[in-house]
Amino acid sequence: MSILPVIFLSIFFYSSFVQTFNAPECIDKGQYFASFMELENEPVILPCPQINTLSSGYNILDILWEKRGADNDRIIPIDNGSNMLILNPTQSDSGIYICITTNETYCDMMSLNLTIVSVSESNIDLISYPQIVNERSTGEMVCPNINAFIASNVNADIIWSGHRRLRNKRLKQRTPGIITIEDVRKNDAGYYTCVLEYIYGGKTYNVTRIVKLEVRDKIIPSTMQLPEGVVTSIGSNLTIACRVSLRPPTTDADVFWISNGMYYEEDDGDGDGRISVANKIYMTDKRRVITSRLNINPVKEEDATTFTCMAFTIPSISKTVTVSIT
């Protein structure tokens, strides 16, 4: 037997051993916190989630994509592998997709959950993106989850449809993908559809998003009534009333008093009970009214100071009264 084949065979096994020994073990970072639900027969782009978490000194040599338990022939790596594309997905494309990043000394992987659904009335709440505006305000409605498709075409044309209110002059598209709604009304609520044209390989594909717009009641600021000043005398019994009026959707507030760094709340006196707070709540004219009474009995010289009534709500409000002693 010639010694030459033996030498080549030894070199081959040694090389394979060294490559296997040097290959870094791949760290599984688990599943990405967000799941993806996309429409059947429309392009889907998934991001490699761990790329943004890698340190600036990490040099990625290769990014690989695969689907757990299936062939990878439906996956199209784009943007140097940092995203993956499926052009005409079907429900069979639902599943777990894995992004693997490697270099000479490091390897990690992270998975994403993709669900492909059909467009139907029964699925509309599953596939729609909820957005909220307030009545009688100026609000915005944004075509959601399209950044990956417009990264290379910031001037992409986006067409809105699906709601009769789009013909109203109060709704204007000043920026692609954003509808400004002036003087929001209750009947602006509903489902709106935005469609983006995505071009890949010389072909045009539609990317559809459905927005479920909710219009919340107009926020009427809470009001507070409190005198600017009161005059009393030493030894007297003084009561100061602070009246807080709330309108829906704001229906509750914590009302308390502050003076010289001390807090005075209902059922929480200053130790000797000389200063106390009593709150009363009642409804009137669709308003919830909280009357907070600060009682000082007896009045001392040290009470010639300021007391602030604070209503902790959204937004919080406060007023201050000055106590003078004659």
UniProtKB/Swiss-Prot annotation:
Keywords: Disulfide bond, Glycoprotein, Host-virus interaction, Immunoglobulin domain, Repeat, Secreted, Signal, Viral immunoevasion. Belongs to the interleukin-1 receptor family. May reduce the host inflammatory response by interacting with inteleukin-1 beta (Il1b) and thus decreasing the association between IL1B and its cellular receptor. It holds the Pfam family ig. InterPro entries: Ig-like_dom, Ig-like_dom_sf, Ig-like_fold, Ig_sub, Ig_sub2, IL-1-bd, IL-1_rcpt_fam, IL-1_rcpt_I/II-typ. Residues 24-115, 122-212, 221-322 form the Ig-like domain. The gene is OPG201. PANTHER family: INTERLEUKIN-1 RECEPTOR FAMILY MEMBER, INTERLEUKIN-1 RECEPTOR TYPE 2. One of its GO terms (molecular function) is interleukin-1 receptor activity. The lineage of its organism: Viruses, Varidnaviria, Bamfordvirae, Nucleocytoviricota, Pokkesviricetes. This is Interleukin-1-binding protein. Interacts with mouse Il1b. GO terms for cellular component: extracellular region.
